[in-house]
Amino acid sequence: MENIRINTEFIKLDALLKFAGLCETGGEAKELIQGGAVKVNGEVCTMRGKKCRAGDTVELEGQTVQVAEGA
């Protein structure tokens, strides 16, 4: 599992997918999220604006990343 460090209180799910390199564009992120391909903390999430905070895990196509605090 890869840690993705953020310097803010949260990052929106679609932005996290791009930032983590799990998808290339915002449009691709939107399609994946709305299609039910993304899990947040083990549950399918279809809200692209979902606020992901430190400690949350996001899974897409067998790849898992965890949001971590700070630089």
What are these regions, as identified by a protein language model?
Residues V44-A71:
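C-terminal structural segments of small proteins and small subunits
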Residues E9-A54:
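A basic, amphipathic helix-loop patch mediating RNA/tRNA/ribosome contacts
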Residues I4, L16, K30, V58-E61:
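Intrinsically disordered, low-complexity regions of eukaryotic proteins
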Residues E2, G36, E61-Q63:
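Generic structural motif recognizing short loop/turn segments at the entrances and edges of beta-strands
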Residues M1-I11:
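A detector for short, charged/polar N-terminal pre-domain segments
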